[in-house]
């Protein structure tokens, strides 16, 4: 529960003066209206809610794909309520239904009996995991459900169920360097590059997995997904022949004592990857001027210090379509936030890739994930960032004022990422599968305590 006060109310009628609407008032307000105003209402001063259209809600809510779900949702600040107007009176006291990122929304689980460990305190877990736990205590097989069976084995003296890793449905093929000169330039140019053949020799690697994939290659759980593993000096990617872009890209960012800004990316340079057949490659001509989207790099080329090393990432196999507005967030996240996280954690490993969720049911419809970790006990942060043509979710002009808040608003469980991408992570990590599942189902919080 959370304290609420009649002095802390947002009157939505003040925002929708010309619109007929019905509001389900409270800490998780929903609005039903015949027409949704184009004004996003995020930039009024001292505003205590964040509005979302249903498709743009954070994926961790699993709340979007149903005809009964309203069009507009208000994520309200702690201890505030969103109501229609000043006639609302049921406001003093307490309430629940706020964002489950808030610690005040967490319940207390007490387990007592012969099956439970004694005097044991564990990290928070979600309610959807309790059903499997109850079935294990009764020694019965649970019906299909949204929980991750085995993720609460650490609560039990003698776990009834022993989980195993998911079976990989599509294994990677090889993408060798057959010719040092590309059969087609794919409409790409790179004016500053001198010797194409010498630079392409750098792509003739067998693997760099031990550094960039310390916990193993992500397994693909979707059938008939044709892809190959591309190794580079600075990163590894799983390139899909089905979608003509990487399923995932992995790299390690070391803790740098030098805190100066990263070098700029080599300008006006993108080149064909000689390892990928022309028929399965994106073309630079796919991105002419005048479109509302451009191309972005999954692995930032400027993470390499020299121009020679940057050419390893200035490849058509490293690009994804990207709205320019999203590129502002993407660049700041990599150039500033990842460097910050690397210093705080003494180095991080990153996996990122595209998500396709056209009907926003939080299940992958086709083949942003960023785990951060340190040595010893693994720590993970996962984010599923909505790829939108504008940044109206945030108001501040400077990226330093809004990007990290936006990223944190879209934090997710690793399990959410797996459901969306059809990938399975950490299969080569040397620890029991139940402990890996515990890691995958944990939802980090960034809450600031309120007195």
Kindly give the residue locations of the regions a language model identified.
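Short, hydrophobic alpha-helical segments
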Residues: 134-142
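Polar, surface-exposed loop/tail segments
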Residues: 48-69, 141-173
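Metal-dependent active-site segment of extracytoplasmic phospho-/sulfohydrolases and closely related
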Residues: 1-11, 74
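Active-site neighborhoods of enzymes that stabilize oxyanions during catalysis
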Residues: 18-120, 125-133
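Domain-level detector for secreted/extracellular nuclease and nuclease-toxin modules, and
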Residues: 133, 151-152, 158, 163-451
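Short conserved micro-motifs at the rims of enzyme active sites and ligand-binding pockets
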Residues: 83-87, 119-123, 145-147, 361-363, ...
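Acidic/polar loop patches that form or flank catalytic/metal-binding clefts of enzymes
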Residues: 39-55, 82-83, 141-147, 329-335, ...
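Solvent-exposed, acidic/flexible segments
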Residues: 24, 67, 102, 123-128, ...
């Amino acid at each position: 529960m959370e304290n609420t006060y009649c002095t802390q109310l947002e009157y939505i009628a003040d925002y929708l003066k010309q619109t007929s609407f019905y509001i389900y008032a409270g800490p998780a307000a929903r609005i039903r209206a015949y027409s949704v105003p184009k004004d996003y209402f995020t930039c009024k001063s001292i505003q205590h809610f964040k509005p979302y259209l249903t498709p743009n809600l954070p994926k961790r809510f699993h709340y979007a794909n149903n005809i009964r779900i309203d069009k507009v949702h208000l994520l309200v600040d702690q201890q505030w309520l969103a109501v229609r107007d000043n006639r609302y009176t049921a406001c003093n006291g307490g309430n629940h239904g706020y964002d489950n990122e808030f610690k005040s929304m967490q319940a207390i689980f007490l387990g007592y009996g012969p099956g439970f460990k004694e005097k044991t305190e564990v990290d928070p877990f979600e309610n959807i995991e309790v059903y499997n736990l109850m079935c294990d205590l009764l020694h019965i097989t649970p019906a299909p459900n949204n929980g991750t069976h085995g993720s609460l084995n650490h609560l039990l003296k003698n776990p009834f169920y022993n989980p195993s890793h998911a079976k990989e449905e599509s294994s990677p093929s090889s993408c060798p360097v057959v010719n040092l000169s590309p059969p087609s330039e794919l409409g790409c140019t790179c004016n500053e590059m001198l010797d194409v053949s010498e630079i392409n020799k750098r792509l003739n690697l067998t693997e760099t997995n031990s550094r960039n994939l310390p916990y193993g290659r992500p397994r693909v759980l979707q059938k008939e997904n044709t892809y190959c593993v591309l190794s580079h000096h600075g990163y590894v990617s799983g390139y899909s022949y089905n979608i003509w872009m990487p399923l995932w890209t992995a790299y390690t960012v070391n803790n740098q004592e030098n805190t100066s800004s990263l070098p700029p990316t080599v300008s006006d340079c993108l080149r064909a990857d000689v390892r990928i057949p022309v028929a399965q490659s994106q073309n630079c001509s796919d991105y002419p001027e005048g479109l509302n989207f451009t191309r972005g790099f999954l692995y930032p080329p400027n993470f390499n210090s020299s121009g020679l090393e940057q050419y390893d990432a200035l490849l058509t196999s490293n690009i994804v379509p990207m709205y320019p507005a999203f590129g502002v967030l993407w660049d700041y996240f990599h150039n500033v936030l990842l460097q910050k996280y690397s210093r705080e954690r003494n180095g991080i490993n990153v996996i990122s890739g595209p998500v396709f969720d056209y009907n926003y049911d939080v299940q992958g419809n086709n083949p942003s994930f960023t785990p951060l970790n340190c040595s010893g006990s693994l720590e993970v942060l996962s984010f599923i960032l909505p790829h939108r043509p504008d940044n109206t979710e945030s108001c501040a002009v400077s990226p330093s004022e809004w990007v990290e808040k936006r990223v944190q608003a879209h934090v997710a469980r690793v399990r959410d990422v797996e459901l969306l991408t059809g990938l399975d992570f950490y299969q080569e990590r040397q620890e029991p599968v139940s402990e890996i599942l515990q890691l995958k189902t944990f939802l980090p919080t960034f809450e600031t305590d309120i007195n």
